[in-house]
Amino acid sequence: MADHYEVLGVERNATPDEIKKAYRRLARELHPDVNPSTEAQERFKLVTHAYDVLSDPQQRQQYDRGGASGFGGGGGADFSGFGDIFETFFGGGGASRGPRSRRERGQDALLRVEVDLDEVVFGAHRDLEVDTAIVCETCDGSCCQPGTAPVPCDICHGTGSIQRSVRSLLGNVMTSSPCGSCRGYGTVIATPCVTCQGQGRVRARRTVPVDIPAGVDTGLRLQMPGSGEAGPAGGPNGDLYLEIKVKHHDVFSRDGDDLLCTLEVSMADAILGAAATIKALDGDIRLELKPGTQSADIVSVKDRGITHLRCSGRGDLRVGIQVVTPTKLDHREKELIKKFAESHKASEPSLARFQQGLFAKLRDRFLNV
């Protein structure tokens, strides 16, 4: 075991005031709020234990008689070792685990984002303004007014806990409970930052650049690690989650990664065949309609649908055909239709499965393509 005087960096004849000053200096340097490294935490425990012994006249006298081991030739025994044994077997009530840090991870945030269907095809970039917690610029997350630092708690001497000897069936054991003065932190913010009131963070609006990948769909959540709220006392940021909602489009709908739409063609074009140019989400597409095209026929265009979310390639564009029957004809046009009907004897109307209009036909055709 290290010599307590060497741990504090004082002479063996140091006065109580010198011991206290040495402890305060080391505590400011090694406290978890200031130095979160594992090595600093171990040294802080040694410094705290050394101060606990040397700041108590009876324990110091006993330590001086017994040497570096901390046990003397007389007087009461130090129960801290037995407390460790008790904690090992019974899971609590033993020695202190050290002060807890004020640094905590910030909360996650959820933001709902609406995107247009054309943005789903290729992805989009957005600069989103969010109301969140950011690190206080005045104290840089230290919680203290600039030029000051947390001071060790005078009640628990920086340990963050109060130890008491209690009598039990197993004899006297040491129990530990959080210090009520410093709330278990081991330090006290004597001069809180006036900007954040000692929280190390403030509420503010900030702009978050977001790249929305192609292929997203309504209900999908995108995770942005470290873009959530800043943690207390300079703690790490939480995550930001973006919940996607795809806006309704007047022309195109979506089936998986395929795009669906309906093209209205005249009866003459359906009979004779024709070429049609349609405006897709990513540019014009020229379609060739075969002679004899029927309502609810499907024309598929490869790789003109939605970009796949987790792999390369795109879905298809599926165009459902609706043949528009003229409702107003003049006398000459009616005569031409009659002559056409006389030369093309149609079969008698026959029953088929009920379908609620063209949209039902298209739906069935789309599903069976």
UniProtKB/Swiss-Prot annotation:
Annotated CXXCXGXG motif repeat ranges: 136-143, 153-160, 179-186, 193-200
Domain J span(s) in chain numbering: 3-67
Keyword Zinc-finger (UniProt): yes
Needed cofactors: Zn(2+)
Chain sites annotated for binding Zn(2+) 1: C136, C139, C193, C196
InterPro entries: DnaJ, DnaJ_C, DnaJ_domain, DnaJ_domain_CS, HSP40/DnaJ_pept-bd, HSP_DnaJ_Cys-rich_dom, HSP_DnaJ_Cys-rich_dom_sf, J_dom_sf
One GO CC term on file: cytoplasm
Details of cofactor binding: Binds 2 Zn(2+) ions per monomer.
Entry domain remark: The J domain is necessary and sufficient to stimulate DnaK ATPase activity. Zinc center 1 plays an important role in the autonomous, DnaK-independent chaperone activity of DnaJ. Zinc center 2 is essential for interaction with DnaK and for DnaJ activity.
Family indicated by similarity: Belongs to the DnaJ family.
UniProt-recorded name of the protein: Chaperone protein DnaJ
Organism: Leifsonia xyli subsp. xyli (strain CTCB07)
